[in-house]
């Protein structure tokens, strides 16, 4: 199942961002688009991407070319994969499932987030074994051991140890929108969701 949106309006990442801003409830858009604190790190990351320069190589034979990459003794179709993303299904029903299918179609890894909307077992099954598992340190030791056992039992071979969030960060947009876990629906959120039914 392909996502039914007007692809002809998406010519760039900025176009896709604007479409998401229009279609998604503000709370959901801000969860995806926002960052912690004053968002300077996110802004600086985007500036760093803008500074990447590609060097063209001309007058060489490009008849046989490939983006295949070998990493951790596995050959992948592209030199990148899907990063761990929590709560994907907030943005679109079964988004985790669609990402797993795309991973299979493109032979790329998908990293199952500890905050995924879909269980780590289901993501592994849906990805035909292309899934990696994200592990945050700092959780209760019994909880972490249980997660690792579950990941091992269903076949995960790669664990991505995530150390960038030693404590939960303050996210201003989420605070302004009243987003917290567990989520409690406010009148403002209800109206926002009702006016963005997609």
Region spans (language model):
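Hydrophobic faces of well-ordered beta-strands that scaffold small-molecule active sites
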Residues: 80-83, 110-112, 131-135, 159
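An N-cap/entry alpha-helix motif that binds or orients negatively charged groups
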Residues: 1-72, 182-198
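Active-site-adjacent beta->alpha loops and helix N-cap segments on the catalytic face
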Residues: 91-96, 112-130, 137-146, 166-179
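A short, Lys/Arg-enriched amphipathic alpha-helix followed by its capping loop at the start of a domain
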Residues: 78-80, 99-108
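Conserved, mostly hydrophobic/aromatic
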Residues: 25, 82, 103, 161
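Phosphate/diphosphate-binding glycine-rich loops and adjacent basic-rich segments that engage nucleotide
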Residues: 157-198
């Amino acid at each position: 199942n392909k996502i039914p949106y007007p692809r002809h309006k998406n010519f760039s990442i900025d176009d896709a961002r604007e479409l998401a801003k229009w279609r998604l409830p503000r709370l959901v858009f801000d969860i995806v688009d926002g960052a912690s604190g004053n968002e300077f790190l996110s802004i600086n990351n985007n500036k760093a991407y803008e500074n990447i320069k590609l060097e063209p190589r001309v007058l060489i034979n490009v008849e046989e070319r490939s983006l295949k990459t070998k990493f951790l003794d596995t050959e992948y179709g592209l030199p990148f994969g899907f990063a761990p993303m929590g709560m994907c299904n907030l943005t679109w029903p079964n988004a985790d499932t669609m990402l797993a299918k795309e991973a299979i179609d493109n032979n790329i890894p998908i990293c199952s987030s500890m905050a995924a909307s879909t269980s780590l077992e289901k993501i592994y099954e849906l990805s035909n074994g292309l899934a990696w598992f994200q592990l945050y340190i700092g959780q209760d030791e019994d909880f972490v051991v249980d997660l690792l056992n579950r990941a091992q039992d269903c076949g995960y071979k790669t664990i991505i140890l995530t150390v960038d969030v030693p404590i939960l960060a303050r996210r201003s947009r989420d605070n302004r929108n009243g987003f917290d876990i567990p989520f409690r629906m406010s009148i403002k959120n209800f109206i926002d969701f009702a006016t963005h039914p997609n």
